[in-house]
């Protein structure tokens, strides 16, 4: 009997060990998928900015104000994407948020590869800025909006995934920042010299398609976790506690965030006016700005 008991215990230990190894491997694979998705999303988000601005630049005679207006538009679109992600994370059920976002991404994919609108002929004098904002909104607005929401959404999905590190998903922000910096620094030195605009647009569209597949995989990992809905409840409690933050605190945060953004636009406009309006001078200040986060 003792031999049978020992054999049974050994078999159980082997199965338990195998289960733990499988769970560890699955957890690592899930972490890699979330990190790669965030890195890819950030790369697409920051490569499309100089790309589309360069597409528009010839229509405005190489004006240095093109990048300044484009930066303001992209920052506003980024804020809109974050607000959309916040609304999904806070109000939508855990199972519904990925569906809504994937539908938005699918609608954005229909606009790819992006191009200048057919009506975007040479702007009339006096309406240059309005023309530029309209072209940006129609030409690249929805793909940029959908991509900008991925960072907060993926971090929220990871926090509900049941992963051992799910309680602190903010380390994934490092993958996002890495993708942003690599994309910005590689654009003037590698992407722009090696590829024409048509090729860049095609590569971006392919990258967006791959990103959608990764988003679907991350959503499946999140929804398949038994802890998903428990994590959703914990997030709700955290949201309730966050309501103690005063309006004054929120206004101070907004004001402090406005200062570096305004300085970025002012400094970039200054150097592109005095030197040249080119992607190299566009991305270096923005990359420096991101590197200070």
Where do the language-model regions lie?
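Alpha-helical transmembrane segments of multi-pass membrane proteins
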Residues: 2-293
């Amino acid at each position: 009997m003792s031999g049978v008991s020992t054999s049974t215990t050994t078999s159980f230990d082997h199965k338990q060990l195998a289960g733990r190894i499988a769970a560890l491997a699955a957890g690592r694979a899930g972490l890699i998928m979330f990190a790669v998705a965030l890195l890819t999303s950030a790369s697409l988000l920051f490569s499309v900015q100089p790309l589309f601005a360069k597409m528009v630049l010839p229509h405005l005679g190489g004006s240095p104000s093109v990048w300044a207006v484009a930066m303001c538009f992209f920052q506003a679109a980024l804020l809109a994407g974050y607000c959309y992600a916040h609304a999904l994370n806070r109000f939508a059920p855990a199972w519904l948020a990925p569906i809504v976002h994937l539908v938005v991404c699918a609608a954005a994919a229909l606009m790819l590869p992006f191009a200048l609108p057919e009506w975007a002929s040479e702007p009339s004098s006096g309406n240059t800025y309005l023309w530029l904002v309209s072209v940006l909104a129609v030409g690249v607005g929805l793909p940029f909006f959908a991509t900008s929401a991925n960072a907060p959404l993926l971090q929220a999905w990871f926090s509900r995934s049941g992963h051992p590190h799910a309680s602190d998903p903010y380390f994934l922000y490092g993958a996002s920042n890495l993708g942003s910096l690599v994309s910005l620094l590689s654009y003037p030195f590698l992407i722009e010299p090696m590829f024409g605009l048509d090729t860049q647009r095609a590569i971006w569209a392919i990258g967006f398609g791959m990103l959608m597949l990764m988003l679907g995989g991350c959503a499946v990992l999140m929804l398949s976790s038994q802890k998903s809905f428990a994590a959703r409840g914990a997030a709700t409690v955290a949201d309730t506690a966050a309501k103690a933050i005063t309006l004054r605190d929120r206004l101070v945060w907004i004001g402090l965030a406005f200062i570096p953004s305004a300085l970025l636009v002012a400094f970039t406009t200054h150097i592109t006016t005095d030197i040249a309006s080119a992607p190299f001078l566009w991305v270096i200040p923005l990359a420096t700005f991101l590197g200070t986060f």
